[in-house]
UniProtKB/Swiss-Prot annotation:
The keyword Cell inner membrane applies. It comes from Afipia carboxidovorans (strain ATCC 49405 / DSM 1227 / KCTC 32145 / OM5) (Oligotropha carboxidovorans). It is an enzyme of class 7 (translocase). This is ATP synthase subunit beta. Its EC number is 7.1.2.2. One of its GO terms (molecular function) is proton-transporting ATP synthase activity, rotational mechanism.
Length: 476
């Protein structure tokens, strides 16, 4: 269908990912998708600002090398629309919904705009139910909510992606419903590994189609900032469609920080004055627009797990700090713990969850979690004394506390299924009842006779006892 002549504009300026387009007596709306061809490929741009009477400033969703001034650009009259529905399962799409897995066109139920309103208060659901992950430290100290929002915070190389992959392994594979994975500005290698891992484990069928359970939406590190700033919304749009059909959806995002980072790259090019630490002035608004849409309604639920990179291990940095307010549970990964060789390197005192209340998890679970935190907190406060004076200067009671705390620390570690290839030890899924039983026994002193090494990288407490016997036999 030919566009009306005035809906065709011409490029007047190209600055990196930002392109100015002049129309004649016509202005496309903000957030509209406008299209041109670049070296034989369709290039989509999103209108970000109106400059003067007939010029718009747009953000490119793909590379702008090869664009020239005077080139024609057409307004589509609507925001970016992406395919949604069961045809997306097992497929990899990019930010504008084009397949990138060489599997032919996506057979979708229809398309949906990536910019949507967040559900109204009256449509939201407030049920409290725990999502068991099989990871001891998470289930005990900062349990996840079904239909809640979960953030995994950590600096570079402390294990966020491995933890998110283990959650996909433990939760998505056992989960009957659909999952959506949004790769936002992370390594392409990891995205490729995940795609093949899903096919090998039977979550997806090669080339999509019947039996696939997870849709993948990628805008990785090599993409321009426009794609990285919008790919999270594309993934969310696919997840929202499943939710509105009455499904319980799992939505994984790796990494939310890259969404913020892309926004800050584009923000300067758009001429906005930067705010704290050079971030965009609209940081909280951008984050809110994404996070408020990730919610559970009366129709269906979205349980989201988001990895959030912490620049220079500083949790007060504006990017991670802005996302804290939106989450139901936070799992904080700590470099000091990973340096001890304890994986997952979750900080048991810094991680929080609104589900850790006796009304939700029950009295026994709550008391056990608090006992564990009490012992670990006491150990933390004694560490200065130990460093200066040594263990001998502690009272008998404190010596016992330290011994138990060190055992608890090691028992919080656990071998992962996704790390089997690196570690050689088989992964463990620990049921919640076994987790509570093990830590309760540890705090009550039932296992004071076992050596520390017996608790390292095991699943249940029975395995620790078994390992203790084995170590004793070897020593004898």
């Amino acid at each position: 269908m030919a566009q009306p002549a005035n809906q065709v504009g011409r490029i007047t300026q190209v600055i990196g990912a930002v392109v100015d387009v002049q129309f004649d007596g016509y202005l496309p709306a903000i957030l509209n998708a406008i299209e041109t061809t670049n070296q034989g490929h369709r290039l989509v741009l999103e209108v970000a600002q109106h400059l003067g009477e007939s010029t718009v400033r747009a953000i490119a969703m793909d590379t702008t090398e090869g664009l020239v001034r005077g080139q024609e650009v057409t307004d589509t009259g609507a925001p970016i629309k992406v395919p949604v529905g069961e045809g997306t399962l097992g497929r990899i799409m990019n930010v504008v919904g084009e397949p990138v897995d060489e599997g032919g066109p996506v057979k979708a139920d229809g398309t949906r705009a990536i910019h949507q309103e967040a559900p109204a208060y009256t449509e939201q659901s407030t049920e409290a139910e725990i999502l068991v992950t099989g990871i001891k430290v998470v289930d005990l100290l900062a349990p996840y909510a079904k239909g809640g929002k979960i953030g995994l915070f950590g600096g570079a190389g402390v294990g966020k992606t491995v933890l998110i992959q283990e959650l996909i392994n433990n939760v998505a594979k056992a989960h009957g419903g659909y999952s959506v994975f949004a790769g936002v500005g992370e390594r392409t290698r990891e995205g490729n590994d995940l795609y093949h891992e899903f096919i090998e484990s039977g979550v997806n069928k090669k080339g999509g189609g019947e039996g696939s359970k997870c849709a993948l939406v990628y805008g990785q590190m090599n993409e321009p900032p426009g794609a990285r700033a919008r790919v999270g919304l594309t993934g969310l749009t696919v997840a929202e469609h499943f939710r509105d059909q009455g499904q319980d959806v799992l939505f994984f995002v790796d990494n939310i920080f890259r969404f913020t980072q892309a926004g800050s790259e584009v923000s300067a090019l758009l001429g906005r004055i930067p705010s704290a630490v050079g971030y965009q002035p609209t940081l909280a608004t951008d984050m809110g627009a994404l996070q408020e849409r990730i919610t559970t309604t009366t129709k269906g639920s979205i349980t989201s797990v988001q990895a959030i990179y912490v620049p220079a291990d500083d949790l007060t940095d504006p990017a991670p700090a802005t996302s804290f307010a939106h989450l139901d549970a936070t799992t904080v990964l700590n470099r000091a713990i990973s340096e001890k060789g304890i994986y997952p390197a979750v900080d048991p005192l810094d991680s929080t969850s609104r589900m850790l209340s006796p009304l939700v998890v029950g009295e026994e679970h709550y008391q056990t979690a608090r006992m564990v935190q009490q012992v670990l907190q006491r150990y933390k406060s004694l560490q200065d004394i130990i460093a200066i004076l040594g263990m001998d200067e502690l009272s008998e009671e404190d010596k016992l506390t330290v011994a138990r705390a060190r055992k608890i620390e090691r028992f919080l570690s656990q071998p992962f299924h996704v790390a089997e290839v690196f570690t050689g030890s088989p992964g463990k899924f620990v049921e919640l009842a076994d987790t509570i039983k093990g830590f309760k026994g540890l705090c009550e002193g039932k296992y004071d006779h076992l050596p520390e090494a017996a608790f390292y990288m095991v699943g249940t407490i029975e395995e620790a006892v078994e390992k203790g016997k084995k170590l004793a036999a070897e020593a004898a």
